[in-house]
């Protein structure tokens, strides 16, 4: 069986068109594949757990590639060192492992965690400005937290899925949707078995409407019931969002920070 190298990747998405290769813009995937080609002498395709959008960051993106028959690709630690030596400053390989199983970065995943950071300051601090969104109006965090709980569980999230994409199903399960406040920053922690296109940013956009008093917390129940994205609020900007963690079942828990209580979590 062909061996695979699995990478845990962090990146600042500010300068990129997203994860996926784009013909007229620079992507994270293109940068990685270009460097792997430089090392191996031929093209190597890198497959990720999911496609982050333009401007979205990652702390724990997972990607894999089939290990070529090449002397530079026998030791995952050496591969990590070589990649980090050649990658730009805004992409880092946190870890690398080798597997000979049926692991697939996307299809083996059982849960993902995204985090969206909000600044409560009118103007974010310089070292935060690329990683958080400042709505510049007062937010009632308690009401946002109350509203968030209406979305926890298994629901049809059609109202939170951007138009223009075809989905085999818009039903997803959120295990956690919490707000954590620390000084002038609020982090929206969203963990689920899978996410629709721009789903997290659309959820944050809806929570912002609740937080500024436009709607009561129960409005999110109405949004779920309508199943119509056109009646929803604008998406929150991409630069506040980060793919924080991807979780896999045994024996693929190389990078897992915590176990999930529900052993039946889906992909």
UniProtKB/Swiss-Prot annotation:
As recorded in UniProt, coiled-coil segments are none
Q: Which SUPFAM superfamilies match?
A: Pseudouridine synthase (SSF55120)
UniProt keyword Amino-acid biosynthesis present: no
What is the active site of this protein?
53
Keywords for the protein's UniProt record, in alphabetical order = Isomerase, tRNA processing
Q: What biological process terms from GO does the record include?
A: tRNA pseudouridine synthesis
Q: Which Pfam families match?
A: PseudoU_synth_1 (PF01416)
InterPro entries tied to this protein: PsdUridine_synth_cat_dom_sf (IPR020103), PsdUridine_synth_TruA (IPR001406), PsdUridine_synth_TruA_a/b_dom (IPR020097), PsdUridine_synth_TruA_C (IPR020095), TruA/RsuA/RluB/E/F_N (IPR020094)
Gene3D superfamilies referenced in this protein's UniProt entry, alphabetically: Pseudouridine synthase I, catalytic domain, C-terminal subdomain, Pseudouridine synthase I, catalytic domain, N-terminal subdomain
Q: What is its EC number?
A: 5.4.99.12
Provide a Gene Ontology MF annotation, just one.
RNA binding
Query: Where do the annotations place substrate binding?
Result: 114
This enzyme catalyses: uridine(38/39/40) in tRNA = pseudouridine(38/39/40) in tRNA
HAMAP family assigned: TruA
Tell me, in a sentence or two, what this protein's role is.
Formation of pseudouridine at positions 38, 39 and 40 in the anticodon stem and loop of transfer RNAs.
Q: What is its quaternary makeup?
A: Homodimer.
Q: Which family does it belong to?
A: Belongs to the tRNA pseudouridine synthase TruA family.
Put simply, this protein is called tRNA pseudouridine synthase A
Instruction: Please name the source species.
Output: Chlamydia trachomatis serovar A (strain ATCC VR-571B / DSM 19440 / HAR-13)
Lineage, broadest ranks: Bacteria, Pseudomonadati, Chlamydiota, Chlamydiia, Chlamydiales
